[in-house]
């Protein structure tokens, strides 16, 4: 191919240590891999113009995006460059060029703006680790000072971040490793019902702790076990005993945390209690409870910059989402006719026009992602002597291997209450039946047509405000390892399917957002409810604070409880005004009159049972949209009345007509 020398130009400002870079769909631009991206250099004019000269094949169409980030020294000599993405362009259609001359200059204007539209998104964890430290009143006040004079005091907290100095004695020794050069970053966030604030700096005396506010410190670092974190505590109400003219008025004491303490715990999440030392005497005067999570990059998987739907939602009429497939078959007033969360149930909902099917995923003992709603199930046990041939024994799903889940006679925990052992013994399908419970996530991804979207709820143990845990499970998998397995299964087997994650656990939502850049997640919340017990996590207690959390984490939106939305219809518009997508769930959604109201409110998706009761067998909205596009593009199809594309158009016809139609009905990215 004849070469063409292309000079790309972009305008924008950078933070210290950052560069602009570009990534695209050819070898010269890294094939959408940020690790192989091309950095730009600043123009000699000094007008915030950045350039890169790249040789491309003349006449070949090239697609590309710009991003802002850091290029780090390799971990090992001769190793691959490590790249951290801070902000990147996520327009549905990337920039494109088809060079037709020997030399060409492309002025791409302002970073983030393409075709007059600004679309930028935050990056994900590529090689760095993120530490989150939180102070909140979910269970009890985070700060406790024993001195009487502080008994009724309110406190302000300031966090200082420092790297520990390392011994340089071995610097002259031959070593294959090279020190990374990344400055640690600190972001402070305040989340409440009314608002969220994100700051990269703090007042001299920090921010005040409030019962209705979640305070969070986010630290990104390449050395998660080599940080010193210092909490300084100040009395918020400065009374007469405070010495006037003090350099730090109201300073009460200090607590120190070495990040190696967290690393040595080998946990992704937990709570640490640190002693607070008096400013003057250096004696212990109290303690602080620090809630933490550690977020690690997804191992063994490199995220592509080809496309991202993390914050994308195409405006459409409200979508019908099949709850657990064809519906709840265990605990609701009117049970579904097909067993929930089975391939048969999911297929049933899909055949009746469901745009998405919702189902629950967690792990078996041998770490296979399985589809099942509850954290526990009932194992059928045969007694040795008694006349009653079987007994039901409740056991956590995580204590059974995938093979055991397929082969053992298991039933839903409701069988313990009904004592209906005949019902639990009724189904004797073999392990390959689509009616079999506990299908693997991989089986589900491979079995259902790609034109039906998946709303994958990631199960995790939740604690109620009264201290009770879901399924009586106070311990569970390591959160990073748990999510790594589920996310890799989805990313490697999803094809072109539309996928939306969701979870009741706020930290799961945070991790899913930070570990990958492709699929969106919704924060599931029950808000104020008369049906379900209040959750311990402050971020889960009201729909408004759930919205603030979603904004802070920059996730797609929330999945709110219908009970709360019917009581407070204004929440729907409030979410939309904040740029959030809003789904709804709950038994109240099964009522067609409630669904009519919710659609009038403007929700984006409704999750409900027994779609087959309300909709005939029919193509879903994505198939209908695909058919309409084909009719517009192919005159031969304009008068066709057939409801599905596959009935009247062979793949060879699409190929001859140069129309690409993928399995999920997207003939180009604009139609996602």
Curated annotation (Swiss-Prot):
Alphabetized PROSITE patterns for the sequence: CBM20 (PS51166), GP_PDE (PS51704)
Reaction equations catalysed: sn-glycerol 3-phosphocholine + H2O = sn-glycerol 3-phosphate + choline + H(+)
Residue sites binding substrate per the record: 68, 86-87
A GO BP entry: glycerophospholipid catabolic process
Spans through the membrane: none
Pfam families: C2_GDE1, CBM_20, GDPD
GO CC annotation terms, alphabetical: cytoplasm; cytosol
Single GO term (MF): glycerophosphocholine phosphodiesterase activity
Domain GP-PDE: start-end pairs: 318-618
Keywords: Cytoplasm, Hydrolase, Phosphoprotein
Post-translational modification Phosphotyrosine, affected residues: 608
Main location: cytoplasm
Subcellular location as annotated: Cytoplasm, Cytosol
Domain annotation CBM20: ranges: 1-113
Name used for this protein in its record: Glycerophosphocholine phosphodiesterase GPCPD1
Organism: Rattus norvegicus
